[in-house]
Amino acid sequence: MASVVTITLNAAYDLVGRLNRIQLGEVNTVETLGLFPAGKGINVAKVLKDLGVNVAVGGFLGKDNSADFEQMFNQHGLEDKFHRVDGKTRINVKITETEADVTDLNFLGYQISPQVWQQFVTDSLAYCLNYDIVAVCGSLPRGVSPELFADWLNQLHQAGVKVVLDSSNAALTAGLKAKPWLVKPNHRELEAWVGHPLNSLEEIIAAAQQLKAEGIENVIISMGAKGSLWINNEGVLKAEPAQCENVVSTVGAGDSMVAGLIYGFEKGLSKTETLAFATAVSAFAVSQSNVGVSDLSLLDPILEKVQITMIEG
């Protein structure tokens, strides 16, 4: 029986490529790194399964091109609770440049009708009660308003479900109203939420404290190569990985961090151990084009070099 379920409302195929520098208005030749069945919650689930945690996956998939997702679920042993909807699951393009900047071209996908959404709400409220943690990840599909999303999350909250929310923009703002147990915006998403640039660690911490003041028990901020922060009632903890010498793609690094955090919670690790492990999993992710941990021993040398600092508390 799975102990965690991840929800991906707006799944996608990720077409991942690499080139030196995008030239706007010109023809660009891109090295193809792969086409992967993805979506933030699915990425989280893949990493968790590699780490030895049983996971279920839910959300929406387009009927017309679901075969690769279904094959991947079978290969990874993921319990499939996805609702199939009319149309195709979208394709998102992720281009990594030599300097490790990533440009995302995220396309609109399937349209969710009111009837399909209500069926999902009814079904998910029933099955989510069976899991220790429900990770809700990614953007909202067409047809699901921020208000509908917040109402669903609030019903999960009222039912006592422990929700991890990893989203951005309108979905993040709406989701906060339901007071999820943990939220994990990255630096840019935090800037978008607070409404202005955050140019120093102090400013990032202050903004994260504002987020916590919304009634959020745990706030995790991922900051790329600069590490991550964990803000809760115990104080502010900072984790910093060693510099990665071989950055292939940063796609999925944030999802890998969410998986590492959930792994720590499931295994009963301390706050320090959990943040260090999640930071190591995220740092490992940038060394590959796909998401996952094929060999757990590869995490050990990265984990040994993660530096943990208590800033407040």
UniProtKB/Swiss-Prot annotation:
Cited Pfam families: PfkB (PF00294)
NCBIfam families: 1-PFK (TIGR03168), pfkB (TIGR03828), PRK09513.1 (NF007068)
InterPro entries given in the database record: 1-PFruKinase (IPR022463), Carboh/pur_kinase_PfkB_CS (IPR002173), PfkB_dom (IPR011611), Ribokinase-like (IPR029056), Tagatose/fructose_Pkinase (IPR017583)
Upper classification of the organism: Bacteria, Pseudomonadati, Pseudomonadota, Gammaproteobacteria, Pasteurellales
Species in which this protein is naturally found: Haemophilus influenzae (strain ATCC 51907 / DSM 11121 / KW20 / Rd)
UniProtKB keywords: ATP-binding, Kinase, Nucleotide-binding, Transferase
EC supergroup of this enzyme: transferase
Protein name in the entry: 1-phosphofructokinase
MF terms (GO), sorted A to Z: 1-phosphofructokinase activity; ATP binding; phosphofructokinase activity
CDD domains: FruK_PfkB_like
Catalytic activity: beta-D-fructose 1-phosphate + ATP = beta-D-fructose 1,6-bisphosphate + ADP + H(+)
Enzyme Commission numbers on file: 2.7.1.56
Residues holding ATP: 222-227, 254-255
Gene Ontology CC: cytosol
Family membership: Belongs to the carbohydrate kinase PfkB family.
Residues at the catalytic site: 255
PROSITE patterns: PFKB_KINASES_1 (PS00583), PFKB_KINASES_2 (PS00584)
Gene it is expressed from: fruK
Purpose: Catalyzes the ATP-dependent phosphorylation of fructose-l-phosphate to fructose-l,6-bisphosphate.
